């Protein structure tokens, strides 16, 4: 899809936990919180607090009030999107809940762009979050169990990223334009190892990237970088091989947010970072400002 009147990104903000702040991108985040519970009683409440912090920082950076937001496109990893529901209730704006797992920020930005380009509003907020402890509790093993993590496993990021999207750049201060996008399909190679999500996601990433290049009649060299959310080290290796089999070489310009946000050697994060907050925080703090 191509947007005839490309929406623009006015501002972006990021809030992360202490481990993320100690990683390679630590200096770029707007706020690094040392308390893993963000002053709250539960992991879920912590994530809600983190998401609201990111949203409010983005709104302030854009020079807007919450009342000017026509829509919120937001999501997290928890059941019923409870981090989003309880976190953004204070904004008192219409919400579209988005559950795209690790692709949530990309999906939210695309949906926001479609709404604004279609004339449904002037401003939208795309925000997502994840929390290591909340994700482990819901999807993997209780933290006190102390299970062994294979090297193919990723580490769920404690982080949130928020992006303000506008129908037009009235002040000439936009960070970027969203000129178009390619929604991905569900591609299943039958990988059943929940501790190797990079291998599970790589085929879909390959399909989306190659379809995008075909749709827009472009080559990888037309882009400064081709960025994925959290394939991690193993997923990246699979992606590069699959893309090459389809006639494209992206090895010299592919970046993965999960590989950028942590140092796997010093931080023991194995294959890299993951979760809704991984791509969102990395995009907001490191990629968009650059």
Question: Would you name each region that the model predicts?
Answer:
Residues 122-155:
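Flexible, glycine-rich active-site loops centered on histidine and acidic residues
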Residues 54-70, 208-222, 290:
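Phosphate/pyrophosphate-binding loops at sites that engage ATP/ADP/AMP, CoA/4′-phosphopantetheine
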Residues 20-22, 83-85, 135-140, 191, ...:
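Short acidic, glycine/serine/threonine-rich loops at helix termini
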């Amino acid at each position: 899809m191509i947007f005839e009147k490309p929406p623009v990104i006015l501002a972006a903000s990021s809030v992360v936990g202490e481990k993320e702040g100690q990683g390679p991108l630590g200096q770029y985040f707007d706020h690094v919180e040392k308390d893993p519970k963000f002053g709250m009683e539960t992991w879920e409440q912590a994530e809600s607090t983190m998401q609201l912090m990111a949203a409010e920082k983005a709104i302030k950076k854009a020079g807007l009030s919450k009342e000017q937001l026509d829509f919120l496109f937001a999501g997290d990893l928890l059941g019923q999107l409870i981090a989003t529901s309880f976190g953004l209730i204070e904004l008192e704006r219409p919400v579209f809940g988005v559950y795209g797992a690790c692709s949530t920020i990309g999906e939210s930005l695309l949906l926001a762009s479609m709404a604004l380009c279609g004339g449904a509003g002037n401003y939208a907020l795309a925000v997502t979050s994840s929390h290591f402890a909340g994700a482990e509790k819901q999807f993997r093993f209780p933290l006190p169990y102390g299970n062994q993590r294979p090297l193919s496993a990723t580490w769920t990021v404690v982080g949130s990223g928020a992006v303000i999207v506008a129908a037009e750049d009235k002040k000439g201060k936009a960070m970027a334009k969203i000129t178009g996008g390619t929604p991905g399909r569900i591609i299943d190679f039958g990988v059943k190892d929940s501790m190797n999500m990079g291998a599970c996601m790589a085929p879909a990433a390959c399909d989306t990237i190659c379809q995008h290049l075909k749709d827009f009649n472009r080559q990888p060299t037309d882009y400064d970088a081709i960025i994925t959310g959290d394939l991690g080290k193993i997923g990246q290796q699979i992606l590069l091989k699959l893309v090459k089999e389809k006639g494209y070489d992206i090895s010299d310009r592919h970046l993965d947010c999960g590989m950028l946000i942590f140092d796997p050697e010093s931080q023991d994060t194995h294959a890299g970072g993951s979760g809704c907050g991984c791509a969102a925080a990395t995009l907001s703090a490191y990629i968009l400002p650059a």
